[in-house]
Regions:
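Short aromatic/hydrophobic contact patches that present stacked aromatics
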Residues: 5-7, 36-38
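Short, surface-exposed ligand-recognition loops at beta-strand->loop->(often short) alpha-helix junctions
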Residues: 6-14
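C-terminal structural segments of small proteins and small subunits
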Residues: 54-86
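Short, flexible N-terminal segments of the mature chain
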Residues: 14-36
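Long protein-protein interaction modules used by eukaryotic assembly/scaffold proteins
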Residues: 2, 14-17, 85
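Extended, non-catalytic scaffold segments that flank or surround catalytic motifs
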Residues: 31-37, 45, 51
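Short amphipathic alpha-helices in soluble, non-transmembrane regions
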Residues: 19-25, 48-56
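Helix N-cap motif at beta-to-alpha junctions
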Residues: 13, 41-45
């Protein structure tokens, strides 16, 4: 199992992104910040990315999936605490 940070920019705010939010719920992602989520999964980053990307319909949308190592050196205030529970 690995923890991934998922970050996105939705470039078309008036578009219906509910399918993306449902996809995040389906993989049991936790909402960390406005457009940042965390997920603990046995799937590789590419699988997570491809699954979510199919729910983003604007070619200008941005999606970033990166491993988050709990032992990594980082600084956060009121955000990363939730990721430690994944």
């Amino acid at each position: 199992m690995a923890v991934f940070l998922i970050s996105y920019d939705l470039r078309k705010p008036d578009y219906d992104y509910d399918p993306l939010y449902e996809a995040l719920a389906n993989i049991k992602a936790k909402h960390v910040q406005d457009s940042v989520w965390g997920v603990n999964t046995s799937s590789p980053a590419k699988v997570v990315f491809d699954y979510l990307w199919q729910h983003m319909h604007n070619e200008k949308d941005r999606l970033f999936v990166v491993p988050f190592d709990k032992a990594s050196d980082y600084k956060s205030e009121n955000a990363i605490t939730l990721l430690k529970t994944l």
